[in-house]
Amino acid sequence: MTALSSKNCSLQYQLHQSPQLLEASCLLFLIILGKVLLNILLLRVRRGDARWTLMEYFCFSLALVDLLLLVNISILTYFRDFVVLGIRFTRYHICLLTQIISFTYGFLHYPVCSLACIDYWCNLSRASKQSSRWQKLLYFLTVILTWISVLAYVLVDPAISVSLKAHRGYVYQCPAYVSTQSHWLSLSMLMVLFVAFLISWQEVVALLQAMRIASYKSKAALYFPFPLHCGYALSCREALLPRLIVCFLGTWFPFVALQVLILSLRVQIPAYIEMNVPWLYFVNSFLIAAVYWFNCHKLDLRDSSLPVDPFINWKCCFVPVHRLKQVERPMSIVIC
């Protein structure tokens, strides 16, 4: 919506200003409500046996922040103009709060991904497991410190302050920040997937033709053909790469296609929408696969310290067919 000068403001425009504000507030409320429901759905359908990692803590913290944002927008929309502790809150603060959250979300992609990658790498590399209580406390403090650091940067950065003040006089116009971090992160992951598939596309096709589904401990499982000399510890990255690709795309292919579409059409999504729990779990699976591939010589499924993906059972990449002694009612289903 285009901003108008004060001398062009007529009585007719002022009469139409309130319905426009109400419509914009309701639209923002519905968007945040849909995002909150999507976050709750993903947190409910995740695997229950997943270990608590740094990314898990951040996903829950993001869902909590989205819920608090929804509550604040609801209060500001309902009461419209009120005073708390001498501070007057109006519809303008809906836009201000949304912009601050957008900037905060937009700058979180790189720190969260870097910390999660370090967390998974350390879990694979260390010889002794840290106390679960102290590890959870460390995760909690790291998440809190990350949120506070990014929020403090947003509030003290001069360029962001100028951007926030630029639209202070126009409560009907509230531009949202579009994160460049998510753009480059998504582009990088898609390029890595494309190169990995290009390198091992023949193995991927052969693997899909030989892969079968069976009932294992009352659960459906995928089994890949392994050479007889393969055990629990893998040292061949070439053999592991196609299995990681199949497992990853088997779960996240719709999300990969969505990312390709967004980048191809150059769709600009506000940061307060783009940073969500499904996106974080998608990045989480990619990071786990990357850490597995780089540390394939250290992998041992009998070690419970291995990171567990909430949506992908990576064990089907490592367990050889000839070791499966507990297969119940094998199904003659071949995926081609």
Curated annotation (Swiss-Prot):
Which keywords describe this protein according to UniProt? Cell membrane, G-protein coupled receptor, Glycoprotein, Membrane, Receptor, Transducer, Transmembrane, Transmembrane helix
Q: Identify a single GO molecular function assigned to this protein.
A: G protein-coupled receptor activity
Topology Cytoplasmic: residue spans: 42-56, 117-136, 208-243, 294-336
GO CC list: plasma membrane; receptor complex
User: Which ranges does the record mark as transmembrane?
Assistant: 21-41, 57-77, 96-116, 137-157, 187-207, 244-264, 273-293
The lineage's top-level taxon is Eukaryota
What spans does the record annotate as topological domain Extracellular, numbered to this chain? 1-20, 78-95, 158-186, 265-272
Which PROSITE patterns does the annotation name?
G_PROTEIN_RECEP_F1_2
User: What family name appears in the similarity comment?
Assistant: Belongs to the G-protein coupled receptor 1 family.
Q: What does this protein do?
A: Orphan receptor.
Protein name, UniProt field: Probable G-protein coupled receptor 160
Please give the organism.
Mus musculus
Identify the gene encoding this protein: Gpr160
